[in-house]
From Swiss-Prot:
Residues modified as Phosphoserine: 13
InterPro entries linked: Histone-fold, Histone_H2A/H2B/H3, Histone_H2B, HISTONE_H2B_site
Entry comment on modification after translation: Monoubiquitinated by the UBC2-BRE1 complex to form H2BK123ub1. H2BK123ub1 gives a specific tag for epigenetic transcriptional activation and is also prerequisite for H3K4me and H3K79me formation. H2BK123ub1 also modulates the formation of double-strand breaks during meiosis and is a prerequisite for DNA-damage checkpoint activation.
Species name: Cryptococcus neoformans var. neoformans serotype D (strain JEC21 / ATCC MYA-565) (Filobasidiella neoformans)
Cross-link (Glycyl lysine isopeptide (Lys-Gly) (interchain with G-Cter in SUMO)): 9
Record PTM N6-acetyllysine, positions in chain: 9, 17
Record protein name field: Histone H2B
Database matches in PANTHER family: HISTONE H2B
Length: 139
């Protein structure tokens, strides 16, 4: 209790802050005991999933001299996330219909056929098959 009397002698701007910190100290003690005491951050920033770097790499392969704005990148990132979620959801449904607990390339291929229209699904399936073959041969 001695620190409270010392805190009351601090300037007025600091005096009101000291009791609040003292009242929060016991609650934080349990959390900070495992954290390093060398002044490191208490919490790391939450990581945000993004396809931006991959979109940029593909753009540079296709059009090396073309750039992309942040707004366009955000739109493409949202588009890729949406398509990924649709395909994953459909593949999950197909796996559950067939009483399987694992999503294989067959479920992904079927879900792409169901979600993407016409010629687009044919190109997506051929590119996907090519990617799976390349991955399998590298193992």
């Amino acid at each position: 209790m001695a620190p409270k009397s010392v805190a009351s002698k601090a300037p007025a701007s600091q005096a009101s802050k000291a009791p609040a910190a003292a009242s929060k100290a016991p609650a934080k003690a349990a959390k900070t005991s495992a954290a390093p005491k060398d002044g490191a951050k208490k919490r790391s920033k939450k990581r945000v999933e993004s396809y931006s770097s991959y979109i940029y790499k593909v753009l540079k392969q296709v059009h090396p001299d073309t750039g992309i704005s942040n707004k366009a990148m955000a739109i493409l990132n949202s588009f890729v996330s949406d398509i990924f979620e649709r395909i994953a959801t459909e593949a999950s449904k197909l796996a559950s219909y067939n009483h399987r607990s694992t999503i294989s390339s067959r479920e992904i291929q079927t879900s792409v056929r169901l979600i993407l229209p016409g010629e687009l699904s044919k190109h997506a399936i051929s590119e996907g098959t090519k990617a799976v073959t390349k991955y399998s041969s590298s193992k």
